[in-house]
Every structure is written in C-alpha cells, then in structure tokens.
C-alpha cells in the first residue's frame, strides 16, 4: 500500500496547504502533546500488558470481606476474620501498586491524546471518518483508566483524610486491583483502536509539518508509474542552500551511492 498511502498523505498535505486557519487550529490542539511524556502513550500500544498478581484470590477474598462485615453485627468475632482478610488484601494491593503507578504517565497521555483526537475530528481533518470509531473505542478505555495512578492530595489536609478512607476501602475490597485488571483487559482488547488513534494524530501532525515545509522551500511531488523506472530532473537538497542540481534516470536498474561521512552524498 506504499503508493496508496503516499497519495493519501499528499491529499492531506494539500488540505492543510489550502487552509491555513485549519492548520493553525490543529497545531494548537497538537501542542498539548509536545511534552516528552507523550512518548509514554506508545507503551499502551507496543508493551506487553502488566499482569495483576494474585488475581485468582481477589474475588474470593473480596466476597469474604463483604460477608464478614455483614455478619459483624450478629457475630462480632467475625471482625477478627475481617482484619485477617484485610491484611492479605493489603499485601495484594501494594504488590500491584508498582504496576498501577507505572501506567500513570501513559494513562495521562492517553487522556490528552483522546482530547486532541476529538478536537481534530471536530475539525474534520483528513482521516476523521476512519478515526471516529477508533476514538469511540479509546474513550471506553479512558473511562476505565481513571483509577490508575490516583493519589492523595497531601497539600490539602481534608482531601488527604478523605483519600485515606478511600484508600482503605480500596484495600479492604480490592477495588483498585479489580479496576486495574479491567483496565488491562480493555487495553488488550482495544489496542488496535489506540494504535489507530495514535496514527491519526501522528499523520495529521506530519501533514501539517510537510505543508509548512512546502510553503517555505522549493519542493516537488513524485508521479508514480508502473515498473522499475525513476527519473529526477535538477534535484537539490531542500534544506541545504547552494547545492548543485543533479538529474538522474534509472530504467530497470538500481544505483548504489557510496562515500565517507560528510562527503556530499545527500547533496
């Protein structure tokens, strides 16, 4: 699909070349992904999903915790069993805390990327029709990701107290572990959609960059033909001034250009 992709990319570039306001609006949306942390998004696409430790015990322990609390008014000694279950759940909770925190940055970037993709889709940039379904699927993943990386606000005492009780509830009933397992499952199921949205944003960014480059320098566009044939007339490097123009014709043959570093191969 190399030729088809190149032609589609050319049409996208033309769209932004003709509409400077659209390019400026999209550039503003894309600017929220300029931080280096944005690279963390690719971890959700290409890395092997983390495995929740001791997950086979999570649901039975959660049911036991609920049962012992319900029985406590009638059998107070059941609170001792609840404390034992709480200790086990505490170990499971913090055994998985590292995995949860490792996904924190990637999840933040997923939310930013989803917001950016939605804004690009509203502008109806090239590729929007295909990306719409992918954006909808990623939104489902993003909703399940909100538990990941949630931390207390130590700067606010009231918020810290509230967070402490929330954290205790998460531990007692394995809430964070269960939600994290569902989040990992949604990533695995929607990985292609995340990748598609990632490409949609990247291709839009690249098309805007190429459109800007074409407006600032002298460039040309290839015309594809069948067969092994290449003809280039008066070719110069687009980013280096003072290059000697070269004409090249290859018909059914190849060309190997050699030379040491900084010897002028690109010019």
Name what the model sees in each region:
Residues 1-263, 267:
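Alpha-helical coupling/stalk and coiled-coil linker elements that connect catalytic or binding modules
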